[in-house]
Regions:
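Short proline/glycine- and polar residue-rich coil/turn motifs
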Residues: 41-52, 56, 142-157, 241-249, ...
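Interdomain boundary/hinge segments at the C-termini of tandem beta-sandwich modules
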Residues: 90-97, 191-197
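Conserved small/polar residues in nucleotide/adenosyl-binding loops
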Residues: 273-275
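Short, solvent-exposed loop/linker segments at the N-terminal edge
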Residues: 8-14, 108-114, 208-214
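Short glycine/proline/serine/threonine-rich loop/turn segments at secondary-structure transition edges
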Residues: 57-68, 158-167, 257-268
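Extracellular acidic loop/turn motifs
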Residues: 25-29, 125-130, 225-229
Length: 275
């Protein structure tokens, strides 16, 4: 009789030893062909022979399982009647967990109001379902099946008060992709934001028309909110204060009184700013 045995357990990518064993020594050299294509040689006068066969390699997407092989053909041996046991020889292939990692990169430098491109990349193409990457700035990046990266655009802040600075964003979470284990690279992606000079304009307006002796309201207006209180001195001696965070302030000034000798006219006022 001829039977087949195999290594009982091996790690992914390891080597399985298949051994064909005879109950009687071979009269001539013989070969034993297995269902996996491997061939075992048994020398004349020997009762067994072996061959090494590579177990399935490490797979980042799925766990390992069982591998079996059976005898499909024999030649030689010079036996009157050789009975080959076709029972499969089974090997447990143990899983080695593969960590796939998703990381984040960003545009290195941009101007205020410019575009920052955040790119999430994984070291093995996505299968099964898209990978959804959540960023610390509230945005998400979806890497589609078949791809290993995807990007999203972000507009750099444009601050009229304090120009320039930096942006630092990291991955908060990543899910999907049918990986055995998907890890997140916690390193932040940093972008230097260069200042673009923001011109802030101050303008002065007044009540269009008022009766002699009435009240004129002068209003100073900024195109951007004040970072600190702004004092506006008018040419008529009046002072307007614009509070921090506000864009305008007002002051009330009495118009020239009634004059029995001359008609009323126009009142013109200029402003001087003081912060």
């Amino acid at each position: 009789d001829l039977n087949l045995s195999a290594t009982s357990s091996v790690a992914e990518g390891g080597s399985i030893v298949y051994t064909a064993t005879l109950t009687n020594a071979a009269g001539t050299a013989m070969t034993v062909t297995l269902s996996n294509g491997a061939v075992i040689n048994i020398a004349k006068g020997a009762t067994s022979g072996s061959v090494n066969f590579a177990a399935p390699k490490d797979d980042v997407y799925k766990d390992a399982g069982k591998v079996d092989a059976s005898i499909t053909k024999t030649t030689g041996g010079n036996f009157e009647n050789l009975v080959a046991d076709k029972t499969p020889a089974v090997t447990d292939v143990t899983d080695t967990i593969n960590n796939s990692t998703v990381s984040l990169t960003a545009t290195a430098s941009t101007v205020e109001g410019g575009i920052v491109v955040y790119t999430a990349s994984v070291n093995a193409p996505v299968t099964g379902s898209p990978v959804v990457v959540s960023l610390s700035n509230g945005q998400t990046i979806t890497i589609p099946v078949g791809s290993s990266s995807a990007s999203v655009n972000f507009v750099a802040p444009n601050d009229a008060l304090a120009g320039g600075g930096s942006l630092s964003v990291k991955i908060d979470d990543a899910k999907g992709g049918n990986y055995e284990k998907l890890d997140v690279d916690g390193k932040s992606a940093d972008t230097s934001v260069t200042d673009s000079a923001d011109a802030t304009t101050l303008s002065l307006s007044a009540t269009d028309s008022v009766a002699e002796g009435g009240s004129i309201v002068y209003t100073a207006s900024l195109t951007n909110a004040a970072g600190t209180p702004v004092t506006v001195n008018l040419s008529n001696g009046a002072v307007i204060t614009i509070a921090a965070g506000a864009t305008s302030g007002s002051v009330t000034v009495k118009a020239p009184g009634d004059d029995v000798y001359k008609d009323p006219g126009k009142v013109e006022v200029l402003s001087l700013i003081h912060i």
